[in-house]
Curated annotation (Swiss-Prot):
Reported function: Does not have hemolytic activity but shows a strong cytotoxicity towards alveolar macrophages and neutrophils.
GO biological process assignments: killing of cells of another organism
Organism expressing this protein natively: Actinobacillus pleuropneumoniae
Name the UniProt record assigns to this protein: RTX-III toxin determinant A from serotype 2
Transmembrane segments annotated in the record for this chain: 154-170, 315-331, 397-413
Repeat (Hemolysin-type calcium-binding) residue spans along the chain: 743-760, 761-778, 779-796, 797-814, 825-842, 843-860
Membrane-topology annotation of the record: Multi-pass membrane protein
């Protein structure tokens, strides 16, 4: 028993010990696992920090005792390492062992150390020997492979080629697995980088494969909302044309050429929600191929590892990859291709005109777009690979160190790509710049100036109809037209991108000749001198043998020369500074012996300079000095100071085509006829053409170019004291369309107020004043003057002398002084007419008018369309006043006394006006308020005696007539004609002495008076020469005024 008991006790003891040992083992295992997990976390954290800190470095670690010269390709790689951006580090064995153990990478040639991503030389050498395809390309057996390897752009081309191939549909799983390493994802990244070099030789294959992928891309895009046009365009891309491009940058520049800016995200008017939706749609439908390819590989690896491939796991991986893809990155690509397309279409026309710069600019954006597209696509793929790997590691397919390695590799490749982007873009720009240099060497002229020439040719084609019409419009036989081709953005952009901004000008000015509606191929033979020199500010058309128009069709920059200098202001920033050496005046020598028109409206005379080389802000004014010839000239001035020497002939200066403030024309100090000083206010709201310095910025990757250039703007001056001062010599007529003040000389003045409320004062001399539009005040003062109010409510004061006053439209007030012969015509509106002490013709015209003749024998006119007129004649008893009822017969007129007034009204038309002769019956003073003779259209006459002083009843006017014969009636009309002719021939002294005709054209006078008196029609209300400014006396002003009266017939 004891033995059995002892055995049981021993077994029990042993069982308890075993239980204790098991528990102890479990605790040890548990603690070990916990320690292992903790160490793994710490290791992963350390690796993560290392990647973050050193992931942008690539180091080739070589043991000091290692001899790599026997390796095929390794030795050449070491030689090229420096140019490839790989740091070579020689270490002893102990350091190498530590590095290997840091992440368990003893059997791999890529690891992560504190120095960065590390290539271990022995393992790399073995890898190159194992993969003979790679080593043969790297090694010397390929002849010039090492030299190609040393050129970063060739390496980058290879990177883009292989990744383009991957995206083109090559099985991603097989491409990665081909390395055969136990750490599949890590070696996948290494193999990917290694295979880049060998793919240089597969350029044509890559392009063809990529073309297929582009077409697939198009099919996807066609079904995406808002991308149908893009998709259809992409599907039309042909690989055959691309396959001829060869290696390097030219491969890149042939990719994705069909992408346009049709992406929904580019719609500036789209809401935020619309853009977000468009972004998801772009990710899911357009770039879905990348997500699918990477996801397929990750899922395949999970299946091999015996891990779950269920829906949730797949969704996790796919969503991680999708989030790594940024649709916005592709929008910049689309911009480049769209700009290339737009400029390319624009270039076709100008290539035919001898300029291919727009085509070069289009090529640049095409190549820049393909570079951007390639890098963006590759970076997107790499981001997707890294994101998929991270998602897989979350499912325990691989450990965190491997994930970090892959992330580091992809980040490094992306960094190399991005760093290489700038040299690639600069290479393209340099290549285009070389083409420009070759052209200039061949043709011996400035390339960009040739661009302006082409632009001008196109302008002539597009504007021919307008340009050829100027002869007829300005009534000249020939037109000399000056055009400024201003700064061109495409030309400037090409100069900026190629770094040739210092060879560019702000534009170019041209002179063209039109005659009989045709563009002359060359300068007319009679122009023996240089016609136009914008650098000196000289224009000479003095030898022209025909009437000529000189016109600045477009605004012309100020005269002078430009120079430019390109300087670097930052690592990637450059500015091409502009220096202008300007002239202070334009000098124009006009046609000597023929009439000419000078339209200076678009001449820029103000320059506001604020540039990088100016000391603060500078302002300068360019004065115009114009010497006209002996013909009858017209001058339209610009908004700057001018000096006009008109010479012989009847010359007119106009201020009505430019904006100006208060304008004062002063002839009070003139010592000769036609001499005036003019002051124009250009401040406040007045807009003027002003030359300014602007700049245009261009980006070539990171490089930014700023070009300064001259341009112009129509704007307010910004200077409260800005004025223009003109000196006019031998000018016969002046016109303006602003709020003006005209101060005449002691000689004859001809002023046009045009628009605005003007004050025109002729002072001494026989003046002709036109108010034109606006509420104007016209003062003839001394002399025999002609005053025309025009439109608006005007005040016309004839002053002393024999005057002709025409109110025109509006409610006008007309008054004359002295005792001369005057014609006062109210025109339309309710007017007030005040005669002088002399003999006056008062015609109120239409409207309700007030007519007061004053002393002297006055002549009143009334017609059926006149409205309600009141005549107040306050004359002497000896006066003989006459009232002519132009189209009325006494048979249809009732005469009635109302208080002291005498009224005439129609007896069969209640809507006709009433003519009231105020105070007809009023006595008790020395004034005579009666009209001595009242004559109807038939010549029948009523006298004051016929009506008597005791007339109270309403009577038919014809009943008051005495029995008279027809001969007597005709005699009455003849007497009126004589009276009217006397007033007209004396009012205004309309003879033109310098044309040898100081008298009156008797035949014309008799003809026009006969028309007025013998017809039943009315006086015209139009003013002399019409309402405009351009019609002037040609032979006899008297005849013109009579012609106006004739139009009353």
């Amino acid at each position: 028993m004891s033995t059995w008991s002892s055995m049981l006790a021993d077994l029990k003891k042993r069982a308890e010990e075993a239980k204790r040992q098991v528990k102890k083992g479990y605790d040890v295992t548990k603690n070990g696992l916990q320690y292992g997990v903790s160490q793994a976390k710490l290791q992963a954290l350390a690796a993560g920090k290392a990647v973050q800190k050193y992931g942008n470095k690539l180091v080739l670690v070589i043991p000091k005792e290692y001899d790599g010269s026997v390796g095929n390709g390794f030795f050449d790689l070491v030689k090229a390492a420096e140019e490839l951006g790989i740091q070579v580090k020689y270490v002893n064995r102990n350091e190498l062992e530590v590095a290997h153990k840091s992440l368990g990478t003893a059997d791999q040639f890529l690891g992560l150390t504190e120095r960065g991503l590390t290539l271990f030389a022995p393992q790399l050498d073995q890898f190159l020997q194992k993969h003979s395809k790679i080593s043969n390309v790297v090694g010397s057996s390929t002849g010039d492979a090492v030299s190609k390897l040393a050129k970063s752009q060739t390496i980058i081309s290879g990177i883009q080629s292989v990744l383009g191939t991957v995206l083109a549909g090559i099985n991603l799983n097989e491409a990665i697995i081909s390395g055969g390493s136990e750490l599949e994802l890590a070696e996948a990244g290494v193999s990917l980088a290694s295979e880049l070099v060998s793919n240089i030789a597969k350029g044509t294959t890559t392009i063809d494969a990529f073309t297929t992928q582009i077409q697939n891309f198009g099919k996807l895009a066609e079904n995406a909302k808002g991308l149908g046009g893009v998709g259809r365009q992409l599907q039309n891309i042909s690989g055959s044309a691309l396959s001829k491009t060869g290696l390097g940058l030219d491969i890149i520049s042939s990719l994705l050429s069909g992408v346009t800016r049709s992406f929904a995200l580019r719609n500036k008017n789209a809401s935020t929600s619309t853009k977000v939706a468009a972004g998801f749609e772009l990710s899911n439908q357009v770039i879905g191929g990348i997500t699918k390819a990477v996801s397929s590989y990750i899922l395949a690896q999970r299946l091999r590892a015996g891990l779950s491939t269920t829906g949730p796991a797949a969704a996790l991986i796919a969503s991680s990859i999708s989030l790594a893809i940024s649709p916005l990155a592709f929008l910049r690509v689309a911009d480049n291709f769209n700009r290339s397309k737009e400029i390319g279409e624009f270039a076709e026309r100008f290539k035919k005109l001898g300029y291919d710069g727009d085509k070069l600019l289009s090529e640049f954006y095409h190549e820049a777009g393909t570079i951007d597209a390639s890098i963006t696509t590759i970076s997107t793929a790499l981001s997707a690979i890294a994101a998929g790997t991270a998602a897989a590691s979350a499912g325990a397919l691989v450990g965190a160190p491997i994930t970090l390695l892959v992330t580091g590799i992809t980040g490094l490749i992306s960094g190399i790509l991005e760093f290489s982007k700038q040299p690639m873009l600069d290479h393209v720009a340099s290549k285009i710049g070389n083409k420009i240099d070759e052209w200039e060497k061949k043709y011996g002229k400035n390339y960009f100036e040739n661009g302006y020439d082409a632009r001008h040719k196109a302008f002539l084609e597009d504007s021919f109809s307008l340009l050829s019409s100027f002869n007829k419009q300005y009534e000249t036989e020939r037109a000399v037209l000056i055009t400024q081709q201003r700064w061109d953005e495409y030309i400037g952009e090409l100069a900026g991108i190629t770094g040739k901004g210092d060879k560019l000008s702000s534009g170019k000015a041209y002179v063209d000749y039109f005659q009989e509606g045709k563009l002359l191929e060359k300068k007319p033979d009679d122009f023996s001198k240089v016609v136009f020199d914008p650098t000196k500010g000289e224009i000479d058309i003095s030898n022209s043998q025909t009437s000529t128009l000189l016109k600045f069709v477009t605004p012309l920059l100020t005269p002078g020369t430009e120079s430019r200098e390109r300087t670097q202001t930052g690592k990637y920033e450059y500015i091409t500074k502009l220096v202008v050496k300007g002239k202070d005046k334009w000098v124009v020598n006009g046609v000597k012996d023929k009439g000419a028109v000078y339209d200076y409206t678009n001449l820029i005379q103000h320059a506001h300079i604020s540039s990088s080389v100016a000391r603060g802000e500078e302002y300068r004014e360019v004065r115009l000095v114009s010497h006209l010839g002996n013909g009858n000239d017209k001058v339209f001035l610009a908004a700057g100071s001018a000096e006009i020497h008109a010479g012989e002939g009847h010359d007119v200066v106009y201020y009505d085509k430019t904006d100006t403030g208060l304008l004062v024309i002063d002839g009070t100090k003139a010592t000769e006829q036609g001499r005036y000083s003019v002051t124009r206010e250009l401040s406040g709201a007045t807009k003027i053409l002003r030359e300014v310095i602007k700049n245009q910025k261009y980006a070539v990757g990171k490089r930014e170019e700023t070009l300064e250039y001259r341009d112009y703007e129509l704007t307010q001056s910004g200077n409260s004291n800005l004025k223009a001062h003109d000196e006019l010599h031998s000018v016969e007529e002046i016109g303006s369309n602003q709020r003006d003040e005209f101060k005449g000389s002691k000689f004859r003045d001809i002023f046009h107020g045009a628009d605005g409320d003007d004050l025109l004062n002729g002072n001494d001399g026989d003046d002709i004043l036109y108010g034109d539009k606006g509420n104007d005040e016209l003062r003839g003062d001394n002399g025999n003057d002609q005053l025309y109010g025009g439109e608006g409510d005007d005040k016309l004061l004839g002053g002393n002398g024999n005057n002709y006053l025409s109110g025109g439209d509006g409610n006008d007030e007309l008054q004359v002084l002295g005792n001369g012969f005057n014609v006062l015509r109210g025109g339309k509106g309710d007017d007030k007419l005040y005669g002088s002490s002399g003999s006056d013709l008062l015609d109120g015209g239409e409207g309700n008018d007030y007519l007061e003749g004053g002393d002297g024998s006055d002549f009143y006119v009334y017609r059926s369309t006149s409205g309600n007129h009141t005549i107040y004649d306050q004359g002497k008893a000896s006066d003989s006043d006459k009232l002519y009822l132009s189209d009325l017969s006494f048979d249809n007129i009732l005469v009635k006394r109302v208080n002291d007034n005498l009224e005439f009204r129609s007896n069969n038309n209640s809507n006709s006006g009433v003519l009231t002769i105020k105070d007809w019956f009023k006595g008790g003073n020395s004034y005579n308020h009666k009209i001595e003779q009242i004559v109807d259209k038939n010549g029948r006459k009523l006298t004051a005696g016929n009506l008597g002083n005791n007339f109270h009843d309403t009577q038919q006017a014809s009943s008051l007539l005495k029995n008279v014969t027809q001969e007597q009636n005709e005699s009455n009309l003849s007497s009126l004609k004589t009276e009217l002719g006397k007033i007209i021939t004396n009012a205004g002294n309309f003879g033109v002495a310098k044309q040898g005709n100081t008298g009156i054209n008797t035949a014309a006078l008799n003809n026009e008076v006969n028309k007025i008196i013998s017809s039943a029609n009315t006086f015209a209300t139009s003013q002399l020469g019409g309402s405009g400014m351009g019609t002037l006396p040609s032979t006899n002003v008297n005849s013109m005024m009579l012609g106006n009266l004739a139009r009353a017939a």
